[in-house]
Amino acid sequence: EKKYFSGAPEHLKSVRREFPQIPILRKDFLLDPYQVLEARAWGASAVLAIVACLQPAQLIGLLSSARKGFLDVLVEVHNAKELETALESGAKIIGVNNRNLKDFSVDIRTSFEIARLLEKEQGYCLIAESGLSERNQLLELQDAGFQGFLIGSHFMNNQNPGELLAKLVAG
């Protein structure tokens, strides 16, 4: 998505050519199953579905299209109501966005609140998104049940993102 994420189809294609084995997420505002097919054609292995931007039927359609195209779907939620919609739609990979889409404030307690709602559930992969910049945050979230992290602007706003990643991972 060009306007909000500064992305373009060529970015996905070039990353796929350079790194044929790594998972690649199309981070975009997907509204139509056709966009899932585009993602597959461009080299993505997963797509983002933001519950706040979709009707339940749209989410189900995106999930169905992704399954047919052998793509994973990172279903993004911001609160308990959106989590319920995601689960009812059959989502298995749940991304908890700590950024409030209305005022862009960030609160990582959102991730912990959603994790508590899922603590008795099994078969879900939890990914924490936004506002993550410290190793101790990642360790605490991992202890709460998160299996992955989507960290974007923290790396993109740094001159040496690789070095920053090494510090984040190694401590």
Residue map of PLM features:
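Glycine/Thr-rich beta-alpha phosphate-binding loop at enzyme active sites
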Residues: 1-7, 87-116
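Active-site beta-loop-alpha junctions enriched in small/polar residues
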Residues: 1-3, 29, 52, 78-80, ...
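Glycine-enriched alpha-helix->loop->beta-strand junction motifs that scaffold or abut catalytic
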Residues: 18-22, 41-47, 67-71, 88-95, ...
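Catalytic cores of alpha/beta
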Residues: 31-43, 78-89, 128, 132-151
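Glycine-rich phosphate-binding active-site loops on the catalytic face of alpha/beta enzymes
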Residues: 38-58, 95-104, 146-165
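C-terminal helical cap(s) of enzyme catalytic domains, especially alpha/beta-barrels
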Residues: 108-117, 142, 157-171
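Catalytic alpha/beta core domains of metabolic enzymes, predominantly
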Residues: 111, 115-129, 133-134, 152
